[in-house]
Regions:
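Catalytic cores of nucleotide-sugar-dependent glycosyltransferases that transfer UDP/GDP/TDP-activated
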Residues: 1-487
């Protein structure tokens, strides 16, 4: 099968979140299964042209009512046959940032920028003489691709090409003023005809949902949640209408990077038969975070983006967050790695000055993230919603019992300990009291039933989260998309 991934980001070239990891990991797994996979994305300012191969002759790409000349460069995912093509347009992409910057969180001309990406993807296929079976668009920034395929170019060259749209996070939809519609390079009839109109403006993701042949999201539970009023961000009605083409497919993880048996970033490697070695990792974590070195005290790890979605208010809000109570009333240590909303960063630093058993690193550090996974006894994720989540999976792999809220991918990957079996601890409500109670329950099991706690750790470590399993599910979705256009 020939598969074209259209994306705003892909590791190792550009990354703002888990989407970039998923695109590359899925492409690699599909390639290993024998499929011809290519990725197309913008060449941002920080992607060095000197490390890429120039493709002679620019593309003429629709931009508003005219055309723009777009250069093309080529590379590949490391140690693979997956070609990565970069669309080069200095005005649109030659800037620092994928979607925006710290000072301008959302570039005002993103509709124009990502219309160049989507139109350019099809022009690239023409240039290469390579016509995919599947165009796989990722999130709102690539949502114009299914629209173009269905309403603009489904002629002889792309007559047998189907589209799949993956929603990584429904909270981000690409909503802009109607004034930007001409920059999309499509005729005005598609403002309504392709489902782009939303509250008098443009909603790129809504258009993609309306036009894609198949729609996937990153966990089965999240696929259900986005069809509800509570979890639908205004798209639930449309998603229910299109419910027969919506599938939830769990992300896999890169086991070459996240594997306690081989991880070079932790002080000692281990597996489910040598869990006692986690104590070495725990002592190193306590030392690095300047926590008292004590094997007997359970350590709770937190690695997170400090954003409302992640349940930070329930932990850190000055008037009602439970972190101070948790560290004062339960004999635990807490190791935090994260950055994000300034109020939360400041509150964490304030709490740290009052609590000797809570330490934080504001920012991101790859080696510390691995050490927290390996050295903690528990990993806390009180997310309000979580499309898939990866850290709870890393935690299970590393024998670190996740404490999570029952939502999205967290509900699909963690089994609540019921007294006899389970791989972690689940709570239902997004409240400080619910978080506190779940932590207390988990620590009680750890302290008073070592055999049960070891069984929880081993249950998580025996799970299979490889991308091979996820890739097969995506292939099934691709085949379903192709059947739909055969009708």
């Amino acid at each position: 099968m020939k598969i074209l991934m259209v994306t705003a980001e892909a590791v190792p070239f550009a990354k703002t979140g888990g989407l970039a990891d998923m695109v590359s990991a899925l492409a690699l797994s599909l390639s290993k299964l024998g499929h011809d996979v290519k990725i197309v994305m913008p060449r941002y300012y920080k992607i060095d042209r000197k490390k890429l191969q120039a493709i002679p002759g620019p593309l003429a790409v629709a931009a508003g009512t005219s055309e723009s000349w777009v250069g093309v460069y080529e590379s590949a995912l490391p140690s693979s046959n997956v070609a990565v093509y970069f669309l080069d347009h200095e005005g649109a992409f030659g800037r620092d940032g994928v979607y925006g910057t710290k000072s301008e969180t959302d570039f005002h001309d993103n509709p124009y920028r990502f219309s160049l990406l989507c139109h350019g993807a099809f022009q690239l296929c023409r240039k290469l003489g390579w016509y995919p079976d599947i165009v796989h668009a990722h999130d709102w920034s690539a949502s114009l691709a299914p629209i173009i395929l269905k309403h603009v170019i489904r002629n002889d060259l792309f007559a047998k090409t189907a589209s799949v749209l993956t929603i990584h996070n429904l909270g981000y939809q690409g909503q802009y003023a109607k004034d930007w519609f001409p920059s999309l390079g499509i005729h005005w009839g598609l403002y309504y005809g392709a489902g782009l109109e939303h509250n008098g403006g443009i909603n790129l993701l809504q258009g993609g949902i309306s036009c894609a042949d198949m729609i996937t999201t990153v966990s089965p539970t999240y696929a259900k949640e986005i069809q509800t009023t509570e979890g639908g961000f205004g798209m639930d009605g449309l998603l229910r209408v299109r419910g027969d083409v919506v599938r939830g497919i769990l992300n896999g993880i890169d086991e070459d990077v996240w594997n306690p048996k081989t991880d070079p970033l932790i002080p000692v490697n281990y597996d489910e038969t040598s869990l006692e070695k986690k104590a070495v990792c725990k002592r190193e974590l306590q030392k690095r975070m300047k926590l008292p070195e004590d094997d007997a005290v359970p350590v709770i790890g937190i690695v997170t983006r400090l954003a409302d979605q992640k349940g930070i208010a329930e932990l850190f809000a000055p008037t009602y967050g439970c972190m101070y109570r948790l560290c004062s009333e339960i004999d635990v240590q807490v190791a935090i790695l994260g950055s994000g909303e300034k109020w939360c960063e400041n509150e964490i630093l304030s709490l740290q000055s009052k609590l000797p058993n809570m330490r934080a690193y504001i920012g991101y550090d790859e080696s510390l993230s691995h050490l927290i996974e390996a050295g903690s006894d528990f990993f806390l994720m009180p997310s309000k919603y979580e499309p898939c989540g990866l850290n709870q999976i890393y935690s299970e792999m590393y024998g670190t019992a996740p404490i999570v809220r029952r939502t999205g991918g967290l509900a699909d990957t963690v089994e609540d300990f019921d007294g006899t079996s389970g791989s972690g601890f689940i709570f239902n409500e997004s409240t400080p009291d619910a978080v506190f109670s779940a932590v207390k329950r988990a620590v009680t099991v750890c302290r008073h039933d070592e055999k049960a706690f070891a069984a929880i750790q081993e249950a998580g470590m025996r799970k299979n989260f490889s991308w091979d399993k996820s890739a097969e599910a995506y292939l099934s979705a691709y085949r379903a998309a192709l059947k739909r256009i055969e009708r």
